[in-house]
Amino acid sequence: MKIDVLSIFPDMFDPLRQSMIGKAIEKGLIDFKVTDFREFTTNKQRHVDDVVYGGGAGMLLMPQPIFDAMEEVKKENNGDKGHVILVDPAGRKFDHHVAKKLSTYNHLTFISGHYEGYDNRIRNLVDEEISLGDYVLTGGELASMVIIDATVRFLDNVLGNSESAADDSFQNGLLEEPQYTRPANFRGIQVPEVLTNGDHEKIRKWRLKESLRKTFLRRPDLLEKRSFNKEELDFLDDIKYEESLDSDQ
């Protein structure tokens, strides 16, 4: 996958070159480049922003540097600008499903803004607008990094274990069940016995039930978006009964 980023703070993306993503870059699984669109300004002061027409607080990113930077991206990629993403609070909310969809593109280009916002004409370059949530950051760099990190996890051979992404929270519409490692007893806190007895079917059922329980208690909204088989419905009935007993104590 080719990933281009347009930003006036390219050094902020250096952490993405570490850990698993860094290894994926080294292996050639990801071609990652950040373009400083300040380099494409035409004014002497190298300003990338200007005042808002009609008045108003703050400054807006001007279209010219970003349009010219995008032309450079196209030139470097044989006319391909990629699937262009504008990171903006007004975009659709980012989630697991969006990340998985983005991972199917061969080329992604992120426009990471700053200041008060963008000249609206910049949106003529954009294929999709994405938001991390109902809050505003000082710039789009952090949001772009989150989206990139979550997306590339779905690429083949990026994660060390091919099952890691498949087992993540949200992969099957549920939160991941509680997990444990050695020792089996730590300061009197015991790993559930079912996980140590070697019965794979019992372990599967425990994991499914505890995944449902965790989702029921912490993110019940996820259950509203999901269909269930009979086993899951039976587990949910058990969970609701067990939790009602706990709340009465």
Swiss-Prot record:
Pfam family, one: tRNA_m1G_MT
Sorted UniProt keywords: Cytoplasm, Methyltransferase, S-adenosyl-L-methionine, Transferase, tRNA processing
GO molecular function, one term: tRNA (guanine(37)-N1)-methyltransferase activity
InterPro entries: Alpha/beta_knot_MTases, tRNA_m1G_MeTrfase_C_sf, tRNA_m1G_MeTrfase_TrmD, tRNA_m1G_MTases_N, tRNA_MeTrfase_TRMD/TRM10
Primary location group: cytoplasm
Cell compartments where the protein resides: Cytoplasm
Tagged with keyword Ribosomal protein: no
Reaction(s) the record says it catalyses: guanosine(37) in tRNA + S-adenosyl-L-methionine = N(1)-methylguanosine(37) in tRNA + S-adenosyl-L-homocysteine + H(+)
SUPFAM superfamilies in the record: alpha/beta knot
GO biological process, one term: tRNA N1-guanine methylation
Annotated S-adenosyl-L-methionine binding sites: 113, 132-137
GO CC, one annotated term: cytosol
Listed EC numbers: 2.1.1.228
CDD domains: TrmD-like
Subunit comment: Homodimer.
Family designation: Belongs to the RNA methyltransferase TrmD family.
Protein task: Specifically methylates guanosine-37 in various tRNAs.
Name of the featured protein: tRNA (guanine-N(1)-)-methyltransferase
Organism expressing this protein natively: Oenococcus oeni (strain ATCC BAA-331 / PSU-1)
